[in-house]
């Protein structure tokens, strides 16, 4: 293992993922430790911390060291901390995130990252997988890279979220209508340059990207189908088996992820803090 005097870093795959040991996220972290964690995140794209006993306040405070926090317009949040999204899946509320996606790309400045804490786990199953979009880009042919670098895509809240499940109550219907009105479709580059590493990566996903701008519908669908299959290759992926208290921190600018929906009828409760980022751009060369 390699790392700083505090952190021990164990890579999980050549492309993506590492376990960080030697840090208690419940304790206030020095600026130096935060920088070490940031550098590990940039290098490994998703990092994991085991056996972390975090309150929602502590999780929020740790995530806020990396930027302003996002409050999701639809999902339930902690009663005292709207920045902490509560993902509580069980028989009466099955998971809806079991598709490959990058979080919240339907806003002008999608998140730079997210911190996910395991609060209650099923006895088996319920893993999460992450895929490296920079590794996926590098695996494309040079002509395909150049073609994609000239394209933009539409990301749309209403494409991903429907009124189903909310329409049963007036409050739910109003909440959905408000979210749609406040989140019109946005345009992002198909290939995004990472603002800190300078690496290019694929920045479309099956959940929020409705179409490729400028292409005919059948052309857009064919290209999206190809890219959505391409990014799932196992060489780009790390699969994390959750343990009680574990924390995942991923770079949302260069990854996709998905939950594995195999744990019902058991319950799985996760808390997520989402860190806002910057407007995606592509910088040639």
Predicted regions and their residues:
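Non-heme Fe(II) oxygenase catalytic core, chiefly the N-lobe of the double-stranded beta-helix
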Residues: 2-247, 252-285
């Amino acid at each position: 293992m390699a790392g700083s005097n505090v952190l021990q870093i164990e890579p999980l795959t050549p492309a993506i993922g590492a376990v960080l040991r030697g840090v208690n996220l419940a304790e206030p972290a020095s600026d130096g430790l935060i920088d070490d964690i940031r550098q590990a995140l940039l290098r490994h794209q998703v990092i994991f911390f085991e056996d972390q006993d975090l309150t929602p306040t502590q999780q929020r405070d740790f995530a806020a060291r990396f930027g302003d926090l996002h409050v999701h317009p639809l999902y339930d949040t902690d009663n005292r901390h709207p920045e902490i999204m509560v993902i509580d899946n069980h028989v009466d509320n099955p998971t809806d995130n079991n598709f490959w996606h990058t979080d919240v790309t339907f806003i002008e400045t999608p998140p730079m990252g997210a911190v996910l804490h395991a609060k209650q786990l099923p006895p088996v199953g319920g893993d999460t997988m992450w895929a490296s979009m920079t590794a996926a880009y590098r695996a494309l042919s040079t002509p395909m890279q150049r073609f994609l670098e000239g394209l933009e895509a539409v990301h749309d809240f209403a494409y991903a979220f429907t009124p189903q499940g909310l329409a049963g109550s007036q409050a739910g219907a109003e909440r959905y209508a408000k979210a749609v009105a406040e989140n019109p479709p946005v345009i992002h580059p198909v290939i995004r340059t990472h603002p800190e590493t300078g690496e290019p990566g694929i920045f479309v996903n099956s959940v929020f990207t409705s179409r490729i701008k400028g292409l005919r519908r059948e052309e857009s669908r064919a290209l999206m189908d190809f890219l959505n299959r391409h990014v799932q290759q196992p060489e780009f992926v790390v699969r994390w088996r959750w343990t009680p208290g574990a924390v995942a921190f991923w770079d949302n600018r260069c990854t996709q992820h998905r939950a594995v929906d195999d744990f019902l009828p058991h319950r799985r409760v996760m808390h997520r803090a989402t860190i806002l980022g910057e407007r995606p751009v592509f910088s040639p060369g």
